[in-house]
């Protein structure tokens, strides 16, 4: 997710938005109205396709609304600061147009296989754009190969692993049991093809989205007093030098790029605008107008990022679990019982430095700093990546042989050890080993701030549903990519079985 990829993803969306005269923005709400209308749920006479326009979008959303909406948002706000949410919104605003274009093209250039099923996606659009010449064929094959590989990785193993870990940590059910049940459920559904997947998605996706949105709104309004400060942090840190994970402020350009990188990256991971995957499911829609279906499918980016991801982001920001100044200083920490190594340096009368490595461990009666002989020491600690909160202390890095300097004073702040764990120094000289809460755990802490332990269960259930729907959606994407390469029905049936079995290994 470097500058080149950011320019390609966001830049393409910006170009198309201006090129289309902001049509996608102006037609967003009419498109949402059309999406939720009765007409979008039926297959009209005169068109062709496998499923209704609504079912096609729900199948596409099944693959896009996943762990990124819960884990990805939290990770972006930790790594890129709260301001990463702003860049998610910006990328989604222009990603709407990208999604419109790729889905409309997919329907325009779709074909019908021997079984009367629709086949579409970027591989077909690319071939048409190059007039079926060799460069287009090569690019189309490459896209299909990468989509097929992604179906097993991001669309299968990653999601299955998230489900089994969540079920094990919350309900203490062995991972192999979860894997077995999940494998059987996926196999039963995907063997029915697009009809079965779309029927399940049409019920599961709206239900799980409403479930999560309602729970998130309860958390947000339960922390209503924290909303102003949370919003302030989100917008200020999107353009400030205090949004780098670890809490160290850098140059404005560097930290903005970091916030932008994580915001755009996690946003695309969540809504898949520009990746082309949603266009594969869009091609199955029963319609005679590719522009109309393009408008309907672009609503997926709005619902995924502007709605669901925003719920997660505001729940985290308003609850205060992320912190009020930066992502690592005042965040939510948990005690880490593992030993950590720090370097201590004694300033004597001759201003000499003692560079002995000590181990600091938690004890039953509190905390202690001991040397390698087991003696309690009073040396002033110095570790990597100093963060001072109240007093100015002159520390340089000492780890890895870099000279350290110190002034004798009471310390208050947060440092990191060799492994990157946070070490917090309090005013009374106590030392605590603290690990920053990240990912799904951070979202759980946000929900727990209002709903208690029930909040943890709700996030876990949401994570399970989101990940399960992603598996179903990506099975269809991978199958159609394989059909483009192999063009034999038997291969697709074999893929369905193999895909389902791979779920167990996740």
Tell me what each language-model feature is.
Residues 324-355, 359-360, 396-400, 409, ...:
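N-terminal glycine/threonine-rich, aromatic-flanked beta-hairpin/loop signature
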Residues 8-32, 160-167, 174-236:
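Membrane-interface loop-to-helix entry segments
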Residues 1-63, 67, 77-84, 95:
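N-terminal alpha-helical transmembrane segments of multi-pass membrane transport
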Residues 6-11, 137-145, 169-194, 210-211, ...:
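Transmembrane alpha-helical segments of multi-pass small-molecule transport proteins
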Residues 16-17, 91-116, 127-161, 165-189, ...:
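Helix-loop-helix module between adjacent transmembrane segments
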Residues 102-110, 215-235, 244-251, 285, ...:
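Extracellular/periplasmic helix-exit of transmembrane alpha-helices
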Residues 42-77, 105-129, 145-148, 249-302:
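Alpha-helical membrane segments and immediately flanking helix-loop junctions
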Residues 384-414:
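N-terminal helix-cap/turn-to-beta initiation motif at the start of protein domains
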């Amino acid at each position: 997710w470097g500058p080149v990829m950011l320019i390609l993803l966001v830049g393409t969306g910006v170009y198309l938005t201006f090129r289309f005269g902001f049509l996608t923005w102006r037609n967003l709400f009419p498109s949402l109205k059309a999406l939720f209308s009765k007409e979008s749920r039926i297959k009209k006479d005169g068109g062709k396709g496998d499923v209704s326009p609504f079912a096609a979008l729900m199948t596409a959303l099944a693959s896009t609304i996943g762990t990124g909406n819960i884990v990805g948002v939290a990770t972006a706000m930790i790594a890129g600061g709260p301001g990463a949410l702003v860049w998610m919104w910006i990328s989604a605003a222009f990603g709407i147009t990208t999604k419109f274009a790729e889905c409309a093209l997919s329907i325009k250039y779709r074909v019908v296989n021997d079984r009367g099923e629709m086949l579409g996606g970027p591989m077909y659009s690319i071939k048409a754009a190059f007039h079926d010449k060799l460069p287009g064929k090569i690019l189309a094959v490459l896209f299909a190969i990468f989509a097929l590989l992604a179906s097993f990785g991001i669309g299968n193993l990653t999601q299955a692993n998230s489900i089994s870990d969540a079920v094990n940590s919350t309900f203490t059910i062995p991972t192999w049991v979860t894997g077995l049940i999940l494998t059987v459920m996926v196999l039963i559904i995907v063997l029915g093809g697009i009809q079965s997947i779309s029927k399940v998605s049409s019920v599961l996706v709206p239900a799980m989205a409403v479930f999560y949105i309602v729970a998130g709104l309860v958390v947000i309004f339960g922390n209503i007093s924290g909303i102003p400060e949370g919003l302030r942090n989100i917008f200020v840190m999107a353009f400030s030098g205090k949004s780098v994970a670890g809490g160290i402020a850098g140059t404005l350009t560097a930290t903005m790029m970091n916030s932008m990188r994580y915001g755009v990256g996690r946003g695309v991971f969540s809504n898949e605008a520009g990746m082309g995957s949603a266009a594969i499911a869009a091609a199955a829609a029963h319609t005679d107008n590719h522009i109309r279906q393009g408008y309907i499918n672009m609503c997926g980016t709005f619902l995924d990022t502007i709605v669901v991801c925003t719920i997660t982001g505001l729940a985290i920001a308003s609850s205060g679990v992320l912190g009020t100044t930066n992502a690592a200083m005042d965040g939510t920490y948990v005690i880490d019982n593992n030993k950590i190594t720090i370097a201590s340096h004694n300033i004597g009368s001759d201003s000499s430095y003692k560079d002995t490595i000590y181990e600091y461990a938690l004890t039953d009666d509190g905390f202690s700093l001991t040397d390698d002989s087991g003696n309690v020491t009073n040396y002033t600690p110095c570790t990597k990546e100093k963060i001072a909160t109240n007093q100015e202390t002159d520390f340089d890095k000492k780890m890895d042989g870099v000279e350290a300097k110190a002034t004798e004073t009471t310390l208050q702040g947060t440092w990191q050890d060799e492994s990157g764990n946070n070490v917090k120094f309090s005013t009374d000289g106590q030392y605590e080993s603290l690990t920053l809460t990240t990912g799904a755990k951070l979202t759980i802490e946000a929900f727990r701030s209002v709903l208690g332990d029930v909040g943890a269960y709700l996030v876990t259930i949401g994570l399970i549903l989101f990940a399960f729907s992603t598996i179903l959606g990506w099975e269809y994407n991978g199958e159609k990519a394989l059909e483009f390469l192999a063009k034999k029905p038997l291969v697709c049936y074999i893929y369905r079985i193999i895909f389902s079995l791979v779920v167990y290994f996740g």
